[in-house]
């Protein structure tokens, strides 16, 4: 995914948590600029087969295959992307709340990661939910965040490590909560596979209607709401009107 190029920010901002360190990092980049040119050449080398393919079949070096699909950076759907019943990241993957809590702890325990991960995640959230189809089609939860779970494992692990230093009952309670979240996540995934969570049309009513059931119950499908995809491609998010004959 081309938008993942923002990972470069993580490496640039690693161990940068004050202005002095930022100055030092900028100076370092300029001093070692030839290193970064080498990295760029290596990057382009990996992409060379794709460039050749594009030129051969489209006569274009860079071919945009999404045609009329685009980002709407002036209208990011951040709230819905994080919390909505349709495809809220933190609703369907609540385990990541632990990582977000851990990001606060980074500023006190692991400063070298603090700014790098925060800036990266904020920018990633903004870019991901600026895409016209912020729910990203047929999938369980927000699949676009899967690429970032390795990075988010750092603040997650920090939370567990800090809790391990507390009283045993607190640590055991925390581990138990993590276990419950894992079970919940797998339960929700099974619901998705069995059909009681729709891949894109889930509403609050539909979510709770069949919450305790793996398979959709009677009346479930009447509670779904399909986005108007044509309008969404224009940056307007409304519900597609149902045909009264159906």
Tell what function each PLM region has.
Residues 6-43, 100-110, 154:
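Perimembrane helix-loop-helix junctions
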Residues 10-11, 33-104, 117-128, 183-195:
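Membrane-lumen/periplasm interface segments of specific transmembrane helices
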Residues 17-24, 56-60, 105-112, 134, ...:
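Juxtamembrane transmembrane-helix termini
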Residues 32, 36, 88, 110-114, ...:
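Membrane-interface helix-boundary signature
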Residues 91-119, 152-159, 174-179:
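Hydrophobic, aromatic-rich transmembrane alpha-helices
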Residues 137-146:
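Non-cytosolic membrane-interface motifs at loop->transmembrane helix junctions
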Residues 139, 173-246:
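Membrane-embedded, lumen/periplasm-facing catalytic core of multi-pass transferases
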């Amino acid at each position: 995914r081309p938008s993942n190029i923002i990972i470069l920010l993580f490496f640039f901002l690693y161990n940068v948590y004050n202005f002095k360190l930022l100055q030092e990092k900028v100076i370092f980049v300029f001093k070692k600029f030839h290193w970064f040119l080498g990295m760029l050449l290596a990057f382009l080398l990996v992409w060379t087969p794709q460039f050749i393919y594009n030129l051969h079949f489209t006569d274009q070096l860079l071919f945009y295959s999404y045609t009329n699909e685009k980002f709407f950076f002036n209208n990011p759907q951040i709230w819905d992307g994080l919390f909505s019943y349709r495809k809220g990241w933190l609703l369907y993957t609540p385990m990541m709340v632990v990582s977000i809590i851990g990001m606060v702890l980074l500023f006190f325990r692991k400063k070298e990661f603090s700014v790098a991960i925060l800036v990266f995640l904020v920018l990633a959230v903004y870019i991901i939910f600026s895409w016209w189809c912020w729910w990203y089609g047929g999938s369980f939860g927000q699949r676009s965040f899967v690429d970032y779970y390795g990075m988010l494992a750092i603040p997650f692990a920090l939370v567990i490590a800090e809790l391990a230093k507390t009283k045993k009952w607190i640590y055991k309670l925390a581990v138990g909560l993590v276990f419950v979240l894992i079970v919940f996540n797998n339960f929700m995934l099974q619901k998705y596979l069995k059909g009681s969570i729709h891949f894109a049309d889930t509403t609050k009513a539909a979510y709770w209607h069949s919450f305790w059931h793996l398979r959709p119950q009677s009346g479930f499908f009447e509670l779904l709401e399909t986005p108007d995809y044509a309008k969404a491609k224009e940056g307007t998010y409304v519900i597609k009107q149902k045909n009264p004959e159906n």
